[in-house]
Each structure stands twice: as structure tokens, then as C-alpha cells.
């Protein structure tokens, strides 16, 4: 990991990205998305994870996360380890149609990392960025929520089930999040906050 992208302050919120090795599109399958969300929910309820925003895409996930206990790095390690083990187990045992191809990619990636015994699911590193201003917070929330729109999956961010955009517009959602305080009534770009609120 580059020196500029490390978690120096374990107490404050960070923008994080977890990416599947070789950008393999694992999360096109609902079963794997649900494993990921179940893990996040467990960590919210039992390990002090605070989420302000998230989105699950086909091969990566963005989070705006904080640890109540000042142990963000430990939380990340737990989430990545648990989800990797459970998803890999499911791929092996459930007859996933792409299993041979995916497992070969994960096996190849593991050979370059001595910490892995057989397979590596997640890329090393999380590209952490400290959330230090309201403007930065809202720009990252906008970036997270607009991922499915930019990818052509939905036309409005809140229509995408696997993100926190629905939380911010009062719709039903899969995960509870700690909503960021909206610093202005309508955070449009002209206000200085780079948020495409009309597309949420």
C-alpha cells in the first residue's frame, strides 16, 4: 500500500474501498452481496462499526466507516477475512457456474501473497481517506451513491438496492446508516457541495 493511504487515526471516519482481486465480478450474484451486507450488519450490531454510506458494485464496495472503539483497522481486517472465507466457501460448495475460472484467479493471486494459504479474494489495501470536512464528506457520499447511475444500472441512485442512497431520501433500505447532517437545504453544486441530489 502506498504510504499516503494508511489509517493513521483509528477514531475518525474514513472513505474506504474493498476490491475483488482482478476486478472479478463476484457481486453480480445476490447471494454474495447478501453475505457482504450480513457481515456489515453484524459488525454494526456487535463490533462498533458506524456506517455513513456504502455501495456494493459488481467487483468492489465503497464504505464511509468509523469505529466506535477506535479500532477501524481491526474492523476492516475482520470484515475482509470473514467475507472472503464465506464467499469462497460458497463458490466451492454451491456449484457456482463460474467457479473454476474464479478460483483460478483467486489461487493465482494468493501465490504472490504469503499471508494466503490457498486463495486470495480481496485485493491488498483499502485506499483509506480521512473524512475531515463536510464538503469532502458530501463529495464522497455523492461519489458512492452515483456509482450505479454512472454505470448505467439505474437512473436514480436511490433505486439501487445495495447502497445507502435510499436511506438519505427516506426509502426502505437493506442496512441502517448514521445519516450525515445535511449542512444546507439543497446541496447542489452551486452551493459548493458537489452533490447531484436530484439524481438521488
Regions found by a protein language model. Give the residues of each.
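Short catalytic/metal-binding and nucleic-acid-binding patches
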Residues: 1-200
Amino acid at each position: 500500500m502506498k504510504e499516503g493511504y494508511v489509517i493513521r487515526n483509528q477514531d475518525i471516519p474514513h472513505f474506504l474501498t474493498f476490491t475483488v482481486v482482478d476486478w472479478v465480478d463476484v457481486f453480480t450474484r445476490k447471494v454474495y452481496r447478501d453475505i457482504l451486507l450480513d457481515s456489515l450488519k453484524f459488525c454494526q450490531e456487535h463490533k462498533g462499526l458506524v456506517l455513513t454510506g456504502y455501495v456494493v458494485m459488481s467487483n468492489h464496495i465503497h464504505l464511509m466507516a468509523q469505529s466506535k472503539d477506535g479500532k477501524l483497522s481491526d474492523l476492516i481486517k475482520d470484515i475482509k477475512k470473514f467475507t472472503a472465507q464465506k464467499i469462497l466457501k460458497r463458490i466451492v460448495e454451491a456449484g457456482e457456474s463460474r467457479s473454476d475460472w474464479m478460483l483460478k484467479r483467486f489461487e493465482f493471486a494468493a501465490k504472490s501473497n504469503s499471508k494466503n494459504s490457498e486463495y486470495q479474494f480481496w485485493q491488498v489495501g483499502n485506499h483509506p481517506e480521512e473524512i475531515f470536512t463536510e464538503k469532502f464528506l458530501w463529495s464522497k457520499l455523492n461519489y458512492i451513491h452515483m456509482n450505479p447511475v454512472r454505470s448505467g444500472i439505474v437512473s436514480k441512485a436511490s433505486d439501487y438496492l445495495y447502497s445507502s442512497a435510499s436511506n438519505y431520501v427516506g426509502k426502505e433500505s437493506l442496512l441502517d446508516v448514521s445519516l450525515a447532517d445535511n449542512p444546507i437545504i439543497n446541496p447542489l453544486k452551486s452551493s459548493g457541495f458537489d452533490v447531484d441530489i436530484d439524481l438521488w
